[in-house]
């Protein structure tokens, strides 16, 4: 749905499921994260699905016409034929980096945060990277792109990402971290 009067009234909602859910998907839904608008105007939201084997996969949906029509983007773990639980990826969040690339942070069964990068607006994704220093107790996380900062210690430019999730077992002990990507 949408509002064109600052939220005073809303249009009737439109079900986009038929536009984005493939036949092999048993379930398709959004995570609790927010969407992003790319530099070219594309609107993108992270979603996840299950296949016929009940295995989960992260992917994204996007609109290039202001939300009138929607398409499915790529998946870092090719959910249609996935069999291996250790490769499952579920709820996720997407941020846009300074160079225009997308970074997707994904919940998984691996016990650590998993990420992938797209250089083509989410149509394809890099191999996933597991970050051993960031615990993932299988709970939704949040990532927000902050911008580029200069490290006073070494003068290097570092792209800052504000990241939050539970820091230990279960859904407790929330922690907010500043992650950085070093610009070479």
How would you describe each model-predicted region?
Residues 1-182:
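Asp-box/BNR beta-propeller blade signature and adjacent active/binding-site loops
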């Amino acid at each position: 749905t949408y509002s064109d009067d600052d939220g005073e009234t809303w249009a009737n909602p439109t079900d986009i499921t038929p536009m984005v859910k493939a036949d092999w998907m048993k379930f398709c839904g959004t995570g609790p994260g927010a969407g992003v608008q790319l530099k070219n105007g594309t609107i993108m939201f992270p979603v996840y699905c299950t296949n016929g084997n009940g295995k989960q996969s992260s992917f994204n949906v996007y609109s290039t016409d202001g939300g009138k029509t929607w398409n499915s983007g790529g998946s870092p773990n090719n959910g249609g034929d996935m069999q291996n639980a250790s490769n499952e990826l579920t709820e996720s969040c997407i941020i846009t980096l300074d160079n225009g690339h997308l970074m997707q942070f994904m919940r998984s069964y691996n016990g650590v945060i998993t990420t992938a990068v797209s250089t083509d607006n989410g149509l394809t994704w890099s191999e996933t990277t597991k970050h051993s220093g960031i615990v993932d107790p299988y709970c939704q996380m949040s990532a927000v792109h902050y911008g580029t900062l200069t490290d006073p210690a070494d003068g290097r430019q570092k792209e800052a990402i504000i990241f939050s999730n539970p820091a230990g077992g279960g859904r407790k002990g929330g922690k907010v971290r500043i992650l950085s990507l070093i610009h070479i």
